[in-house]
Amino acid sequence: MEILNEPSSTYHQPVLLEESLQGLAIQPDGIYIDTTFGGGGHAKAILAQLKRGKLFAFDQDEDAESIASTWHDPNFTFIRANSRFIQRFLAYHQIEKIDGLIADLGVSSYQIDTALRGFSTRSEGPLDMRMDQSSSLTASQIVNTYSFEALTQLFRTYGELHSAPALAKALIAARTKHPIETTQSLKEIALPFSPPRKSAKFLAQVFQALRIEVNDELGALKSLLEQSLQLLKPGGRLVIISYHSLEDRLVKRFIKTGNFEGELDKDMYGNPLQPFVPVYKKAIVPTEEELVINSRSRSAKLRVGERTAL
């Protein structure tokens, strides 16, 4: 394989890389999907283990597409699209079943470090937060147009913030004076509602809530998980790396029951139908050694499910 542009450590240091590869249990002639190509860290490692196998990588970010365009490997196909459309594109490539699927749900280091993207609480930039820069909804539009009720629900549900009503009220008061257009403006409005000595975590939750709404991240995750049911062969592996409790709860529940309600379906005789078997009893977290190398992996949790014959 010829890769003209190595995945930059500043773009995305692959999180839980060895654990992900072990979870996928890669077969040299298997078919694999990386639904979050990013800087290509996981994808490169998967390709290195394939001989006649295929890797299809998805990402809606144009910067990820730029990196993928420099890869020249007959076993690799990059598709610039949201993971909601995996089945559609695989059907186009005449792929019905796959051996493994991996998704790293984190924002890439490159996206965080690029102030113009508006993801970081530490950089001054426009309040954007779009993963797909061709989409229309931005974080600025949300804080400047959503109603009190909608903002409260957003920060309470996606940010898990007790101060959601007060923050929503403050945003509405501030926007009557001038539009809220930058990350710094948002921080100045939000910080007074932070618990003592927890401002960094609080701001991260505020930004998380807006990012989830802008990109419909939980909706995309649900779609991805549901598609995995249809795509994975018996014995195929589902590997998901999540970064906050909302994602992790969805993934844990889905691997355990095959749905989002948390109860196993049953056949006509009352026997439980379990489409996945958890490979590990608990989520895998980064080692201390990895945390030293990549502090942004601190909140990562990896779960692996193996598709049954149901």
Swiss-Prot record:
Keywords: Cytoplasm, Methyltransferase, rRNA processing, S-adenosyl-L-methionine, Transferase. It catalyses: cytidine(1402) in 16S rRNA + S-adenosyl-L-methionine = N(4)-methylcytidine(1402) in 16S rRNA + S-adenosyl-L-homocysteine + H(+). Specifically methylates the N4 position of cytidine in position 1402 (C1402) of 16S rRNA. The lineage of its organism: Bacteria, Pseudomonadati, Bacteroidota, Cytophagia, Cytophagales. It is found in: Cytoplasm. HAMAP family: 16SrRNA_methyltr_H. One of its GO terms (cellular component) is cytoplasm. Belongs to the methyltransferase superfamily. RsmH family. Its main location: cytoplasm. It comes from the Bacteria. This is Ribosomal RNA small subunit methyltransferase H. GO terms for biological process: rRNA base methylation. It holds the Pfam family Methyltransf_5. GO terms for molecular function: rRNA (cytosine-N4-)-methyltransferase activity. Its EC number is 2.1.1.199. S-adenosyl-L-methionine binds at G40, G41, H42, D59, F89, D104, Q111.
